[in-house]
Amino acid sequence: MENIIARRYAKAIASRADINDFYQNLCILNSAFVLPKFKNIIESNEIKKERKMEFLDSFFHIKNSSFQNFLRLLIENSRLECIPQIVKELERQKAFKENIFVGIVHSKEKLSQENLKDLEVKLNKKFNANIKLNNKISQDDSVKIELEELGYELSFSMKALQNKLNEYVLKII
């Protein structure tokens, strides 16, 4: 449910001319969500809405009236806890708008930057988009490339290759 709500807010922000200002401000608030005290204040029903607004305003040196109105809207609708999802969805929409997609390469060993760049170049050509890859270490012997936004997943497993080779050898015999 929160993802649907976050998607609507992010879509509205993405259509604004000052999307970057909103995004930067939301990132500031999003970074505070790792603090348990911050989350307690945001989620508390005992703290008045005006005090929450003052608290959130204290994070910013330059006041943006549009952003303040947005925060008031979130406070009124008790949706401040949706900020991390809004940031994530806004990042996704910005990337889609700029034709930039982030993918993950799962591998047993850390890949060199050169290998990642080589994969990025090949995927850029295949999808005609700007692909950025991150390496994630996994325990299995397979290599897997995930581009969630494009609905693309490629995996290569040594076990599967060995099984197919065994089947092929058995067929020949």
From Swiss-Prot:
This is ATP synthase subunit delta. F(1)F(0) ATP synthase produces ATP from ADP in the presence of a proton or sodium gradient. F-type ATPases consist of two structural domains, F(1) containing the extramembraneous catalytic core and F(0) containing the membrane proton channel, linked together by a central stalk and a peripheral stalk. During catalysis, ATP synthesis in the catalytic domain of F(1) is coupled via a rotary mechanism of the central stalk subunits to proton translocation. One of its GO terms (cellular component) is plasma membrane. Its main location: membrane. It is found in: Cell inner membrane. Keywords: ATP synthesis, Cell inner membrane, Cell membrane, CF(1), Hydrogen ion transport, Ion transport, Membrane, Transport. It comes from the Bacteria. The lineage of its organism: Bacteria, Pseudomonadati, Campylobacterota, Epsilonproteobacteria, Campylobacterales. It is a peripheral membrane protein. It comes from Campylobacter jejuni subsp. doylei (strain ATCC BAA-1458 / RM4099 / 269.97). Gene3D superfamilies: N-terminal domain of the delta subunit of the F1F0-ATP synthase. One of its GO terms (molecular function) is proton-transporting ATP synthase activity, rotational mechanism. F-type ATPases have 2 components, F(1) - the catalytic core - and F(0) - the membrane proton channel. F(1) has five subunits: alpha(3), beta(3), gamma(1), delta(1), epsilon(1). F(0) has three main subunits: a(1), b(2) and c(10-14). The alpha and beta chains form an alternating ring which encloses part of the gamma chain. F(1) is attached to F(0) by a central stalk formed by the gamma and epsilon chains, while a peripheral stalk is formed by the delta and b chains. Belongs to the ATPase delta chain family. NCBIfam families: ATP_synt_delta, PRK08474.1. Signal peptide: none annotated.
